[in-house]
Regions:
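Phosphate-binding site of ATP-dependent enzymes
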Residues: 1-61
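ATP-dependent carboxylate activation and anion-phosphoryl transfer catalytic cores
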Residues: 55-126
C-alpha cells in the first residue's frame, strides 16, 4: 500500500477500538490510546520504538466513527481497531485489532470483560 504522507504522523496516531460500529466504552471511558513515534521516526508503531499515551477522543474522531461505523457493521466487522492521524482514518485493523491492554493502562477500566460480554451477546443472538 502506498499513500501520501500525512503531516500529523509526526505527532503519532490514535488507536480506537470499536465494537459493532461504535467506540467501546466502559463507564464513559473510551477504549483508545495514542502511539507516539520516537526520535526522528515518523512511524508510531511500537515495534519501531514508539510509545503509548492516553488518548483524547475529539469531535473529529467521533464524527469519523459515526460515518464509518455503519459501514463496518454492514460488512460484518464486529470488533476492529481504527488508527487515526488527526481525524483521518489511516488503517482499519479487522483481523487483529489489539490495544485492549494499552487502553486499560490509561483508562483503568475493564474493557476485556465488556468486550467478552458483547461478543457472547452477539454470538448468542444471531
Amino acid at each position: 500500500m502506498v499513500q501520501n504522507f500525512v503531516p500529523e504522523a509526526v505527532r503519532g496516531d490514535t488507536r480506537v477500538l470499536l465494537v459493532d460500529g461504535e467506540i467501546l466504552r466502559v463507564n464513559g471511558h473510551p477504549a483508545a490510546f495514542r502511539r507516539i513515534p520516537s526520535g526522528s521516526e515518523f512511524r508510531s508503531n511500537l515495534d519501531q520504538g514508539g510509545t503509548t499515551a492516553q488518548a483524547a477522543i475529539d469531535e473529529g474522531i467521533e464524527r469519523s466513527v459515526q460515518r464509518i461505523g455503519p459501514v463496518l457493521r454492514r460488512d460484518g466487522l464486529f470488533f476492529v481497531g481504527l488508527d487515526f492521524l488527526g481525524d483521518k482514518v489511516c488503517e482499519v485493523n479487522a483481523f487483529s485489532p489489539g490495544g485492549v491492554r494499552a487502553a486499560y493502562r490509561y483508562e483503568r477500566v475493564d474493557f476485556t470483560s465488556e468486550l467478552l460480554r458483547l461478543l457472547v451477546q452477539r454470538w448468542t443472538t444471531t
